[in-house]
């Protein structure tokens, strides 16, 4: 049970910047995924940049993503205090106040975009700015509390880091990096809806309109299965445009088919009921799945 004292903390009493807690606002685990996918996008590009410039640029992209995360926690601190999964975050715990989070997130946003324009190129900086603005204003402020399609549309922000990695190296956009975007974009719904199934009580407390609460369990299971099946054409697309070879296609299809099987097993459970263990398995596997897909991209290029 969430300690009711969390709701009554006077956050204005936090007057000193606690940098370890500010770092937590940046969602380090999300940042690590951003660093990885951005690096893959950069390494898959036909053009190259120096190792130093590449590392600086990727770091700046991760800082931009962290800034968006901090602004997300600033705006959603009221919801975070209500949910078991998020109640120990810095703002609900009273370790950082909302003004500090706002200043921190805004400052890092400006810094990361301006610095990326200087160290990389304008296209990459514009894409990073769009990512931050989309995540904060479209997903966090507009969609999150209004529609169960929040993560479908909002997933666009999380799908852009590998595209930015590509533009850092090439200073241009083409069809190839769009395949990275589509893979992450269509992966996102099944990943988060699996989480929302076994954490539905949390979302209910916070009155967040996730699909299990608005459309029911059965509809959620169907949507998870449908989006997992949509991953099949998404992993075939890079091969179809001659971006990758069979070294990518074969294992990517195998990983995706196993994902489909897991989602089908979740779907075929009793009507309007679900197996919590299976939902957790899908959520966990989806993270491993995305990581392996991007690893295979690199292996295909090396071989």
UniProtKB/Swiss-Prot annotation:
Keywords: Cell inner membrane, Cell membrane, Heme biosynthesis, Membrane, Transferase, Transmembrane, Transmembrane helix
Subcellular location: Cell inner membrane
GO cellular component, as recorded: plasma membrane
InterPro entries according to UniProt: Protohaem_IX_farnesylTrfase (IPR006369), UbiA_prenyltransferase (IPR000537), UbiA_prenylTrfase_CS (IPR030470), UbiA_sf (IPR044878)
Biological pathway: Porphyrin-containing compound metabolism; heme O biosynthesis; heme O from protoheme: step 1/1
Membrane topology summary: Multi-pass membrane protein
Main location class: membrane
The keyword Transferase is assigned to this record: yes
One Gene Ontology term from the biological process aspect of the record: heme O biosynthetic process
Keyword Cell inner membrane set for record: yes
One term of GO molecular function: protoheme IX farnesyltransferase activity
Bilayer-crossing regions: 30-50, 54-74, 101-121, 123-143, 150-170, 178-198, 219-241, 245-262, 279-299
Catalytic activity, as annotated: heme b + (2E,6E)-farnesyl diphosphate + H2O = Fe(II)-heme o + diphosphate
EC number: 2.5.1.141
Function: Converts heme B (protoheme IX) to heme O by substitution of the vinyl group on carbon 2 of heme B porphyrin ring with a hydroxyethyl farnesyl side group.
Family statement drawn from the similarity comment of this UniProt entry: Belongs to the UbiA prenyltransferase family. Protoheme IX farnesyltransferase subfamily.
NCBIfam families named among the record's database cross-references: cyoE_ctaB, PRK04375.1-2
Other observations noted: Carbon 2 of the heme B porphyrin ring is defined according to the Fischer nomenclature.
Protein name: Protoheme IX farnesyltransferase
Taxonomic classification: Bacteria, Pseudomonadati, Pseudomonadota, Alphaproteobacteria, Candidatus Pelagibacterales
């Amino acid at each position: 049970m969430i300690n009711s004292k969390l709701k009554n903390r006077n956050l204005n009493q936090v007057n000193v910047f606690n940098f370890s807690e500010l770092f937590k606002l940046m969602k380090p685990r999300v940042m690590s995924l951003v660093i990885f996918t951005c690096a893959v996008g950069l390494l898959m590009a036909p053009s190259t940049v120096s190792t130093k410039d590449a590392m600086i640029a990727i770091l700046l992209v991760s800082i931009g993503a962290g800034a968006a995360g901090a602004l997300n926690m600033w705006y959603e601190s009221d919801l975070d205090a209500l949910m078991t999964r998020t109640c120990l975050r810095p703002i609900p715990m009273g370790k950082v106040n909302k003004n500090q989070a706002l200043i921190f997130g805004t400052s890092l946003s400006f810094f990361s975009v301006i610095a990326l324009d200087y160290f990389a190129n304008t296209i990459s900086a514009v894409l990073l700015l769009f990512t931050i603005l989309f995540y904060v204003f479209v997903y966090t402020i507009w969609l999150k509390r209004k529609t169960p399609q929040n993560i479908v549309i909002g997933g666009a922000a999380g799908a852009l880091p590998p595209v930015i990695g590509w533009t850092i190296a090439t200073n241009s956009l083409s069809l190839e990096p769009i395949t990275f975007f589509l893979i992450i974009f269509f992966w996102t719904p099944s990943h988060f809806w699996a989480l929302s199934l076994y954490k539905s009580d949390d979302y209910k407390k916070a009155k967040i309109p996730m699909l299990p609460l608005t459309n029911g369990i059965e509809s959620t299971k169907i949507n998870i299965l449908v989006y997992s099946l949509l991953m099949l054409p998404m992993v075939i697309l890079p091969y179809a445009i001659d971006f990758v070879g069979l070294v990518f296609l074969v294992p990517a299809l195998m990983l995706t088919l196993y994902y489909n099987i897991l989602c089908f097993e979740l779907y075929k459970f009793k009507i309007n009921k679900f197996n919590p263990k299976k939902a957790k398995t899908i959520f966990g596997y989806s993270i491993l799945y995305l990581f392996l897909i991007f690893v295979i991209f690199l292996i295909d290029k090396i071989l």
